[in-house]
Amino acid sequence: MTSPAKFKKDKEIIAEYDTQVKEIRAQLTEQMKCLDQQCELRVQLLQDLQDFFRKKAEIEMDYSRNLEKLAERFLAKTCSTKDQQFKKDQNVLSPVNCWNLLLNQVKRESRDHTTLSDIYLNNIIPRFVQVSEDSGRLFKKSKEVGQQLQDDLMKVLNELYSVMKTYHMYNADSISAQSKLKEAEKQEEKQIGKSVKQEDRQTPRSPDSTANVRIEEKHVRRSSVKKIEKMKEKRQAKYTENKLKAIKARNEYLLALEATNASVFKYYIHDLSDLIDCCDLGYHASLNRALRTFLSAELNLEQSKHEGLDAIENAVENLDATSDKQRLMEMYNNVFCPPMKFEFQPHMGDMASQLCAQQPVQSELLQRCQQLQSRLSTLKIENEEVKKTMEATLQTIQDIVTVEDFDVSDCFQYSNSMESVKSTVSETFMSKPSIAKRRANQQETEQFYFTVRECYGF
């Protein structure tokens, strides 16, 4: 004899769901902390780069002895206890690789210290300042969008909880109604059997003396049977009604379950990736431009520098947002990995885990399917248009941040008049009218890009 199957109680199902949601909520919180940490590390990196080139400009004026001191200073800083965690977390990212190579290159510098100092102060440092400002601004916007995405995801999870509770309630009502119906059926069978036994046990009497008694007894039995039949009909109707509600509630639960899993998958697989892309929007390209400016100056130095500069150039070539994003997600895999899918939890022996397409819910499901197909067709057309707009906007931003304006070879075209050379190299990076116009266009395009992102999601 097999033991009866043990079903999970409502409290157990709710507790498991709450635990899974709490884990997701904790993961979402850690994601924001991780992005905040990356922003802080990036700001620190950019600040270090600014401090580095500012100090380097001063040292260029004091020749190679002071250049050696600069290299030792920053190498010691990166090896200090305070920066151990920073180095551990960032040693695989391409910008940090460039930073380490720059420190090694300092020992090789030995030419035209006045020109290099002027380029460092009036060209490279303003670029890092610009990158820091842009990065902070974009991160703030990205964080707002990310918070909204997380709020939307939690809203979906809360809606699933509500639908699941409704399913439990209606399924419990259906089971209760079924139990009452079975009880009425048993009473009916019992009453019918009792009536048959009473008729069989009656002793023969004369027609004249027992006619009235038999008629009265039959009337009483029929009345009792009719009452039970009426009660059975009511309970049958109640059971049918509750069963239909339970089926509809289960269908809603299954649909909500599928939608929730799709939303969770979309957030972890697509939205997080896009969110990190937004945080990095233009960062690597702008850093690439700043470091290429440095390379343009350094490549005009003595031939003895070429080996070190080639190594840095290779690192700059490898500045890649996609690779760094992949490394970041691998380093924090437990934060960015998708959670387990929500599984259907059968309630009180209800083992049907598929949508019920039988009458009387078939027509309703067909109508809903048609509505969803129509809506999906409309959304597909809209999304194609939005995708084209996003690609065009993103390409515009990429064109702005990848403009090749890092060549400073003209600064090394010496003439008999050093004043003319100084006048040429002293024109600061931020003072050019075209730069200001391009900056305005960049910010306007960024604003439009995020507006579209916020309206249509990731």
Swiss-Prot record:
Xref: PANTHER family: SLIT-ROBO RHO GTPASE ACTIVATING PROTEIN
Species assigned in the record: Homo sapiens
InterPro entries per UniProt: AH/BAR_dom_sf, F_BAR, FCH_dom, SLIT-ROBO_RhoGAP
GO BP terms, alphabetized: negative regulation of cell migration; nervous system development; regulation of synapse assembly
SS bonds (residue pairs): none
Domain of life: Eukaryota
Protein name: SLIT-ROBO Rho GTPase-activating protein 2B
One GO cellular component term: cytoplasm
Extent of Basic and acidic residues compositional bias: 181-203
Note: This is one of the 3 duplications of the ancestral gene SRGAP2/SRGAP2A which has undergone human-specific segmental gene duplications. The appearance of SRGAP2B in the human genome is estimated to 3,4 million years. Two larger duplications later copied SRGAP2B to chromosome 1p12 (SRGAP2C) and to proximal 1q21.1 (SRGAP2D). SRGAP2B was identified in some individuals but it is not clear if it produces a functional protein.
Function: May regulate cell migration and differentiation through interaction with and inhibition of SRGAP2. In contrast to SRGAP2C, it is not able to induce long-lasting changes in synaptic density throughout adulthood.
Entry keywords, A to Z: Coiled coil, Neurogenesis
Region (Disordered): 181-214
SMART domains per record: FCH
Subunit structure: May interact with SRGAP2; formation of the heterodimer alters SRGAP2 function.
Coiled-coil stretches: 362-400
